[in-house]
Amino acid sequence: MEQELQWLLTQRIPKVVLQAQNSLLGISLLGHKTGPNGHTSRGTSTDSHIHLHDTKTGEDVGEVTVSGAAVTHLSLLLPVSASTQPMRRTTTRLKMDEALPLRQAQEALSFIKSATKKTRLMPRLDSSETALDYVENMLSDVKRARQILTVGSQLELMPLQSDSTEKFAPALPENLVIECKFKEGSIVVHLYFLKFRRGVKSSGGILDAFKKDTAAGHMLVHNGRLAEVKQELVFQAPLGSMASDLDSLDQAASLLIDVVGQLHAFDSM
């Protein structure tokens, strides 16, 4: 039994850690590349131009450009009530330096970097307890990164402003806010048309501090003030690079889970 444990500590685990490292180094999260030193760098081609589809109708409703960990451009078919036509294609750009940070990507990258760093800094594995603590910590980083990229939790709402090339393009309503996030290997764009309640005045400005109040249903809250979601549009498109990155995380997790199981078997003896 002691011989098997020594084989696990001196041969099996180092080999698995190297394989997990290779899987992590294969991740190019939306143009980011994790190097052997645990730092991320950007490749020469990082922009992803993706066609968005309405999740209800399946219609092509525009494009989104994802550059690194941010959305830098949106071209959407939006309903504008002031127009004689029910739908008008309006090119929009985001406020806040005309880019919307994809905080999921940023947060997931921090865990990927942490896991990659752990693969390079293997401690002296002189017991099953030491090895288990080391591998489980690495596995926790990998699982957390994958969870962040697939859950699609509420992140950040921001206002839009029109950048249309049309001569008589209608202005975007002030009560329109947008949210971009990842969910199950796709980029998802939510558009919310708000109606302010409890005497709240027209937005007129910054709405980026809004957060979804799931307990209140289709309500948004800002500094204790409520706004009702009068209309919600959901546009979505698959991200091929994201699917590949999730596969790489799954590969790393599978390798580490196998080792954790072997180490637990020794602890139970």
Residue ranges and their predicted role:
Residues 120-269:
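Extended, alpha-helical interaction "stalks"
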Residues 1-136:
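N-terminal intrinsically disordered, low-complexity regulatory tails that precede a folded domain
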